[in-house]
Amino acid sequence: MATKFPSFNQGLAQDPTTRRIWYGIATAHDFESHDGMTEEKLYQKLFSTHFGHLAIIALWVAGNLFHIAWQGNFEQFVLDPTHVRPIAHAIWDPHFGSGITEAMTQAGASGPVNIAYSGLYHWWYTIGMRTNEQLFQASIFMSILACWTLFAGWLHLQPKFRPSLAWFKNAESRLNHHLAVLFGFSSIAWTGHLVHVAIPESRGQHVGWDNWLTVLPHPAGLAPFFTLNWGAYAQNPDSLDQVFGTAEGAGTAIFTFLGGLHPQSEALWLTDIAHHHIAIGTVFVIAGHMYRNTFGIGHSLKEITEAHNTRHPNDPHKGSFGINHDGIYETVNNSLHFQLGLALASLGVATSLVAQHMGALPSYAFIARDYTTQSALYSHHQYIAMFLMVGAFAHGAIFFVRDYDPELNKDNVLARVLGTKEALISHLSWVTMLLGFHTLGIYVHNDVVVAFGNPEKQILIEPVFAQFVQAAQGKMMYGFNALLSDPTSSASLAANSLPGNHYWMDLINRQDALSAFLPIGPADFLVHHAIALGLHTTALILIKGALDARGTKLIPDKKDLGYAFPCDGPGRGGTCDSSSWDAMYLAMFWALNLLAWVTFYWHWKHLAIWQGNVAQFNESGTYLMGWFRDYLWLNSAQLINGYNPFGVNSLSPWAWMFLFGHLVWATGFMFLISWRGYWQELIETLVWAHQRTPIANLVGWRDKPVALSIVQARLVGLAHFTIGNILTFGAFVIASTSGKFG
């Protein structure tokens, strides 16, 4: 007899109802809950999945390279990167009529194509790629890499090649390896590519497999390196008149500290980027030699954490903070969920910073003038950062349920955080209410006075503290004369004493959207506080969910119920929204709400600057109807007209996605609001009708159909809500921006 799904849980496989399928999918990746799972097997399985993950990434990159080389216009883009619209891939669709075929035949293509808003063309151009042949070669390499990593994943599951549990628990060696080899060496290797390939190409000199061993990346070769005359590598940088990709105005420097942007490509200087990578690679290689290796050389993490205490005789606190980090080393090293939570939080912060800096400090040549790509990449990275951050708190909560040992952590910082959770949660609650009432109150007040014809009665607050911070970095327009905006300050004198030319002040004081600090006023002040409200509310729900994971006054035995337990009904005073899973589920809605405010703000402010109409954001951004009318409605107009009775245009696929996204989003409410009993009755009715209908009654079920549990329905509803949100906003951002700028 064939084994029924899920094979990893034979108890669940015997379930005669459709619950079997749902619970099987839900626990497929929860290796801890699988039959016959040991701690060693768990680590080995997870280790192998990392190789699978790498294979998927390599395959995705290979697919992009292959389709752009095959169906794109990369070589035409290289000749004129500011005017040629990059093609992602061709479209073959049996639903296309002549109108849409004509509308989608664009960017010099002979048939219907999609325009690329991923920034891949700019990335590949910046790193020195110039021909379709190079893209094909890279695609083949990435495909081979995908096969190799898949093989590595399979190999490490074979008995002879399975690492032992002790190998996985050797935190210091793993840290050394990740710091020195993965981060350090890869950063230095990337410097090598930039210096040997990308920088020469940016100066009109091709370096390929045929000549890379004979072309010196710097006229002096390695002599300055060995004679410690490293400054030689910074001399003779590219001039301000350099034409990117040609020898005109090119210098010979490879590691510089120029600051600001290349005037023509409007991206960071490639020589600055190379300097950054060699510096960070060196730091990481040094860091990768700090922790205790198998020869007993280096620091012990356990000793470091346990030395972080207030028990030292000279410490003024004299142990008043408990025993600090005692027990933390074992707690982290023995909990995969703790480690994953830390990794997700770190990556989440980094991804959000990437979103900001791709706009404020663009590193790819000419990408700053591709407004649609910039808008899409900002939204994309902020959305990903949000998912990663919510995941960090989710696994933090699972840690408290599954892995936390109260005895091991007695009176240390973890225990202290749990012990003071009421204070933490109530303070966060107070902050969210303060932000919410005041921000909404000012928006609503402004709305009313504008509606009644008295816009001069709006409450408009200048963000003076933020303006001061900008001035301290060198923004002159506010007249603060602080630090770098004061030519006579110690900061300015120190900056001016650096040898050579530096351009960060030019970048900060630019008059366009590429200024590192855009001018800010009352509209920014209000939306900043709205975003702060979203951040604090999301954090409140997530932190409360994690800190209450083990127990509350209402449910002191919560840790015994697991991470996601169903509603108990009114028996214990009502426990419907009390599992940690429910907190993460509720936080997702606030996180998506917050993302809307963050991305709306960035997008509208930039649209206004790009269109030369800064006053639109500054004047309409101070009241709610301004946001609804002059941002959402005004920018949806072209989108809603993507197709109409008179024909279609190239925005019509985005218009359709906008409509479809709303449908998916609204479908979510069907699962989020309905009661479980209604679904069970509906299913029973449908099954009854099915069984009594000719032809339809030939199809039967092996499993008895049962309604989704409350937790399952919430998940399905949230999935629809989230995907609908992404489809709707993605289509809106791309269509509203490309409709204006191409």
Swiss-Prot record:
Domain of life: Bacteria
Matching Gene3D superfamilies: Photosystem I PsaA/PsaB (1.20.1130.10)
Residues spanning the membrane: 46-69, 135-158, 175-199, 273-291, 336-359, 375-401, 423-445, 525-543, 583-604, 651-673, 715-735
Topology of the protein relative to the lipid bilayer: Multi-pass membrane protein
List of residues binding phylloquinone: 679
SUPFAM superfamilies named among the record's database cross-references: Photosystem I subunits PsaA/PsaB (SSF81558)
This protein's UniProt keywords: 4Fe-4S, Chlorophyll, Chromophore, Electron transport, Iron, Iron-sulfur, Magnesium, Membrane, Metal-binding, Oxidoreductase, Photosynthesis, Photosystem I, Thylakoid, Transmembrane, Transmembrane helix, Transport
Record has Transferase as a keyword: no
Ligand binding (divinyl chlorophyll a B3): 670, 678
GO terms under cellular component: photosystem I; plasma membrane-derived thylakoid membrane
Binding-site positions, divinyl chlorophyll a B1: 662
UniProt-listed Enzyme Commission number(s): 1.97.1.12
Record-listed [4Fe-4S] cluster binding positions: 567, 576
Cofactor note: PSI electron transfer chain: 5 divinyl chlorophyll a, 1 divinyl chlorophyll a', 2 phylloquinones and 3 4Fe-4S clusters. PSI core antenna: 90 divinyl chlorophyll a, 22 carotenoids, 3 phospholipids and 1 galactolipid. P700 is a divinyl chlorophyll a/divinyl chlorophyll a' dimer, A0 is one or more divinyl chlorophyll a, A1 is one or both phylloquinones and FX is a shared 4Fe-4S iron-sulfur center.
Catalytic reaction equation(s): reduced [plastocyanin] + hnu + oxidized [2Fe-2S]-[ferredoxin] = oxidized [plastocyanin] + reduced [2Fe-2S]-[ferredoxin]
GO terms (BP aspect): photosynthesis
InterPro entries recorded: PSI_PsaA/B, PSI_PsaA/B_CS, PSI_PsaA/B_sf, PSI_PsaB
Record carries keyword Cytoplasm: no
Predominant cellular place of this UniProt entry's protein: membrane
Entry function: PsaA and PsaB bind P700, the primary electron donor of photosystem I (PSI), as well as the electron acceptors A0, A1 and FX. PSI is a plastocyanin/cytochrome c6-ferredoxin oxidoreductase, converting photonic excitation into a charge separation, which transfers an electron from the donor P700 chlorophyll pair to the spectroscopically characterized acceptors A0, A1, FX, FA and FB in turn. Oxidized P700 is reduced on the lumenal side of the thylakoid membrane by plastocyanin or cytochrome c6.
Protein name as it appears in the record: Photosystem I P700 chlorophyll a apoprotein A2
Gene giving rise to this polypeptide: psaB
